[in-house]
């Protein structure tokens, strides 16, 4: 009896990459590969990479060095690199890392099976061509990942915003939206398989179908998905503040299934920096959207992104960012030191702050956010939250789920409760999660 081939897959970066990795698992399963959590056991190692910051690229090359060592003792090991670093580097990656067998870009998952088959025959290859818009979703494979009650559903790909610091339009391509009918069809199929929560994915979901007049826009799509029986909760990410329309804000008031949480990246609180970033809004316009969302849904929780040390940011601009954070009161915040990316407008800007200054600002920002996050979590103590149970916690001795506001919560209970939305009384708010008790009738 032939032993099943083993796949080790490592994913870096955003939720779109996580979604793409689910598709990769499905494709490789079709070739007889089963997943393993140990690269030493693998016959095929694939990295799905991120290039949003230089540190992400450096991590990829660091990991490749680890797999190179494994390949020395296992010459038949196939190593492949996909995602945004692969899209950016292309064949150069094969030259930099001659032990890599294949490189596949963000538009080339439909070619992956053929590339792996060629690698099994000893052939190296690189595929990073962008697909035409009309072909992109027709050729892009779908995930058939098994298990779990939450799932990502891609509704659009690419980005047309060209923020000065961002490489996404260069490695993911221009915006293209999937038809509403196809999205709803996938959501129905997921609901039939036991999924109870879907997250609608795109680099900028707010501009869904903006280039396709006559098609449902994103608020319309949310209302269509909310009609699918079996789906208890809907999330979406990521949102661009400039495209947060009144009709989309109304959805938070009108749709009980829409989770009271939004990831709304500000990136800076300084109007001067926001203009240099080409974000398309001022700090006051951003705060007006936040206020409108809070009015529509008083329980809404905000998460976001902030960049510190962007060219032109001085101490006054940084203090503007701190002031915006204080007004919004983010439940959580992803924050980073600016990293110049090749081909972007900001790469041409003079870098006018020292590394020590940038690091100091980041540490001050993160310390302030840490206090806010803990305070917000503690403010939930004694309240009853709607928690969608996802399954066992990482320790295996309790259940794990998320509140509507996207706060991770652990509680005692039977694993059969996975997929249910339960009333949970929060007994303790910690830095990174909540502890709760299921409220029984």
From Swiss-Prot:
Quick check: keyword Iron in the entry?
yes
**Matching InterPro entries:** Elp3/MiaA/NifB-like_rSAM, Methylthiotransferase, Methylthiotransferase_CS, Methylthiotransferase_N, Methylthiotransferase_N_sf, MiaB_methiolase, rSAM, rSAM_horseshoe
A GO molecular function annotation here is: N6-isopentenyladenosine methylthiotransferase activity
Q: Which GO terms of the cellular component aspect does the record hold? A: cytosol
Question: Which reaction is recorded as catalysed by this protein?
Answer: N(6)-dimethylallyladenosine(37) in tRNA + (sulfur carrier)-SH + AH2 + 2 S-adenosyl-L-methionine = 2-methylsulfanyl-N(6)-dimethylallyladenosine(37) in tRNA + (sulfur carrier)-H + 5'-deoxyadenosine + L-methionine + A + S-adenosyl-L-homocysteine + 2 H(+)
Highest taxon in the source lineage: Bacteria
Establish whether keyword 4Fe-4S is in the entry.
Answer: yes
Q: Which residues bind [4Fe-4S] cluster 2?
A: 159, 163, 166
The record's annotation in PROSITE patterns points to: MTTASE_N (PS51449), MTTASE_RADICAL (PS01278), RADICAL_SAM (PS51918), TRAM (PS50926)
Main localization, broad class: cytoplasm
Q: What keyword terms does UniProt attach to this protein?
A: 4Fe-4S, Cytoplasm, Iron, Iron-sulfur, Metal-binding, S-adenosyl-L-methionine, Transferase, tRNA processing
Chain ranges of the TRAM domain: 378-440
One Pfam entry name: TRAM
Domain (MTTase N-terminal): residue spans on this chain: 5-121
Q: Which cofactor does it need?
A: [4Fe-4S] cluster
Location in or out of the cell: Cytoplasm
Annotated family: Belongs to the methylthiotransferase family. MiaB subfamily.
Q: How does it assemble?
A: Monomer.
Its job: Catalyzes the methylthiolation of N6-(dimethylallyl)adenosine (i(6)A), leading to the formation of 2-methylthio-N6-(dimethylallyl)adenosine (ms(2)i(6)A) at position 37 in tRNAs that read codons beginning with uridine.
Q: What is this protein called?
A: tRNA-2-methylthio-N(6)-dimethylallyladenosine synthase
């Amino acid at each position: 009896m032939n032993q099943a081939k083993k796949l080790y897959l490592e994913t870096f970066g955003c939720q779109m990459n996580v979604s793409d990795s689910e598709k990769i698992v499905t494709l490789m399963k079709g070739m007889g590969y089963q997943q393993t959590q140990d690269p030493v056991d693998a016959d095929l190692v694939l990295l799905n990479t991120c290039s949003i910051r230089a540190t992400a690229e450096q991590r990829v090359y660091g990991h490749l060095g680890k797999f190179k060592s494994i390949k020395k003792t296992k010459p038949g090991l196939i190593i492949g690199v996909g995602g945004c670093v692969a899209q950016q580097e292309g064949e150069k990656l094969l030259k930099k890392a001659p032990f890599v067998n294949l490189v596949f870009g963000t538009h080339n998952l439909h070619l992956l099976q053929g590339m792996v088959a060629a690698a099994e025959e000893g052939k190296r290859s690189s595929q990073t061509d962008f697909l035409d818009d009309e072909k992109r979703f027709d050729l892009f494979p779908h995930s058939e990942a098994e298990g779990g009650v939450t799932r990502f559903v891609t509704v659009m790909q690419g980005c047309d915003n060209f923020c000065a610091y961002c490489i996404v339009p260069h490695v993911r391509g221009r915006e293209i939206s999937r038809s509403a009918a196809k999205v709803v069809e996938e959501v129905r199929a997921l609901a039939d398989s036991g999924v109870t929560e879907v997250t609608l994915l795109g680099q900028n979901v707010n501009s869904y179908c903006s280039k396709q007049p006559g098609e449902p826009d994103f608020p319309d799509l949310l209302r269509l998905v909310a009609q699918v029986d079996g789906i208890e909760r809907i999330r979406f990410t990521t949102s661009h503040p400039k495209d947060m329309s009144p009709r989309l804000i109304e959805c938070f008031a009108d749709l009980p299934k829409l989770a009271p949480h939004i990831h709304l990246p500000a990136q800076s609180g300084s109007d001067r920096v926001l203009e240099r970033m080409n974000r398309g809004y001022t700090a006051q316009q951003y705060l007006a959207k936040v206020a409108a969302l809070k009015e529509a849904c008083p329980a809404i929780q905000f998460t976001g992104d902030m960049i510190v040390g962007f060219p032109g940011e001085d101490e006054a601009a940084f203090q503007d960012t701190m002031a915006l954070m204080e007004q919004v009161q983010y439940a959580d915040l992803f924050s980073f030191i600016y990293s110049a990316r090749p081909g972007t407008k900001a790469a041409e800007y003079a870098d006018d702050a020292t590394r020590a200054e940038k690091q100091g600002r980041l540490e001050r920002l993160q310390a302030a956010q840490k206090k806010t996050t803990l305070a917000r979590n503690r403010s939930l103590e004694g309240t009853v939250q709607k928690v969608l149970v996802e399954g066992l916690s990482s320790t295996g001795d309790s259940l794990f789920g998320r509140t509507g506001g996207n706060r991770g919560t652990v509680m005692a209970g039977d694993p059969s409760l996975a997929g249910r939305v339960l009333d949970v009384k929060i007994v303790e708010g910690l830095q990174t999660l909540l502890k709760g008790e299921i409220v029984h009738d």
